[in-house]
Amino acid sequence: MSFLIVANWKMNGMRSSFVDFIGKLNNKSNEITSKLVICPPFTSFPSSIELNNNIDIGAQNCHHKKFGSYTGEISAEMLKELGCTYVMLGHSERANEKDSEIKLKSEIAIESGLHPIICVGENSEDYKNEKTKEVIEYQCKNRLPTHGEYTVAYEPIWAIGTGHVPNNDAIAKVIEVIKLCTSKKHIIYGGSVSSENIENLLSISNLSGVLIGSASLDFDHFYKIIQQVEKKFSLINSKISN
C-alpha cells in the first residue's frame, strides 16, 4: 500500500471549494504516487466529480446500523453509493462515542465495502500521567474490528489543533503498541501535521501515512506536504534501484 495522506476537512469548505480543490489535485496527479483520501463534509460528496486513480473520497463518520429510524444519521451503504471508499471513525471531536459503538461502525463499514480509518489517542491528562500505552491498548481492544481491512490512526487528543506534536520516539512506540494489538500494518499519525513538521515525521520508519486537519484546507499548504512526502519516497526508491 502506498503512503497514505488523509485530509480531514471537518465542518469546513463549501462544495464549490471542494470541486476546485479536487480539480487542482487531478492536475497534479502525475506528480503524486501517494494514496490521497479527502474527507469533506457530507454536502460536498462527489456525485459527478471525476477523480484520478490515486484520489479517494472518505466520510467523517457513519452510523452503526445499515438503515433505520435514526434521524440525522447516514449509513455506510449510503456512503458507498455516493462514491466513498473510506470512512473515518472514532475521531475525538465526535463527543461521547463509546468504544463498542466505534467497533460496530467499523464492522458495518467493512461489510458495506468501505475501508475504515479508526482513530485512537490519549487525552492530555492520560498523557501527563504516562498512561498512553494503557489507553491505546484499551482502545485497540475495544474499537478495532475482528475482520477485514482497516487503517489505525494514532491521533493524541492533546495534539489536535495545538501545534504540538509528540517526539518521533514517542510516536514510534505507540505504533509498536498498536501493532501488538492487530495484525494490520497500516498505522498513520494525526495531530497538528503541517508542512513544517512533515519532514521530521517521515523519519519514523514504521509510519504508513498521516492524517491532516486544518493544514489540508489550503491547497498550497496541503500540496507542500504532498511534495515533501513524494521527495522522501523518491529518494528511497532511487537508493533501492541503485
Swiss-Prot record:
Localization terms from the record: Cytoplasm
Pathway the protein contributes to: Carbohydrate biosynthesis; gluconeogenesis; Carbohydrate degradation; glycolysis; D-glyceraldehyde 3-phosphate from glycerone phosphate: step 1/1
Pfam families documented for this protein: TIM
Kinase is among the record's keywords: no
GO terms, molecular function: triose-phosphate isomerase activity
Enzyme Commission number(s) from the entry: 5.3.1.1
Example of a GO cellular component annotation carried by this entry: cytosol
Family annotation (HAMAP family): TIM_B
Name of this chain's protein: Triosephosphate isomerase
Species annotation: Wolbachia pipientis wMel
